[in-house]
């Protein structure tokens, strides 16, 4: 049986109202076991200041962002189940859900799924890659009972 070990770090000034650890686990379990047997993922939920700093340092973007993915790269010849880290900014996720008129839990689910696919090597820089990644995201979201996260863009 596939197993995803979650290390959840809540690093917000106010952690109330965040999804439960079991929800984060459910979202990871919907993605990662399709691709590998055993994995360990850290999800760190942060405030805008930490997201902004990391986004500037690692992507050269001077603003906070919804999710950052940091895949773990083991040294050659060493196999470890560590998949990587997801850094999710609470305020950006909440603001985007409001602006896009999406249920908040659906947007949290989408950010975990989106970030997990990045950890697994998927990207959306090229159109063809974006289509494949968005298709997988939609398939997983629908399987979890959520709407297509890209429905507004398709209309």
UniProtKB/Swiss-Prot annotation:
Residue positions binding Zn(2+): 114, 118, 124
Give the source's domain of life in one word: Bacteria
EC number per UniProt: 3.1.-.-
According to the UniProt record, one GO cellular component term is: cytoplasm
Any one of the GO BP annotations: rRNA processing
Q: Which InterPro entries match?
A: MetalPrtase_cat_dom_sf_prd, YbeY, YbeY_CS
Q: Which cofactors does this protein require?
A: Zn(2+)
Q: Where is the signal peptide?
A: none
Task: Quote the subcellular location field of this record.
Answer: Cytoplasm
Q: Which UniProt keywords apply?
A: Cytoplasm, Endonuclease, Hydrolase, Metal-binding, Nuclease, Ribosome biogenesis, rRNA processing, Zinc
Question: What does the cofactor section's free text say about binding?
Answer: Binds 1 zinc ion.
Q: Which GO terms describe its molecular function?
A: metalloendopeptidase activity; RNA endonuclease activity; zinc ion binding
Q: Which family does it belong to?
A: Belongs to the endoribonuclease YbeY family.
Q: Say what the protein does.
A: Single strand-specific metallo-endoribonuclease involved in late-stage 70S ribosome quality control and in maturation of the 3' terminus of the 16S rRNA.
Give the PANTHER family listed for this entry: ENDORIBONUCLEASE YBEY, CHLOROPLASTIC (PTHR46986:SF1)
Protein name as catalogued: Endoribonuclease YbeY
Source species: Enterobacter sp. (strain 638)
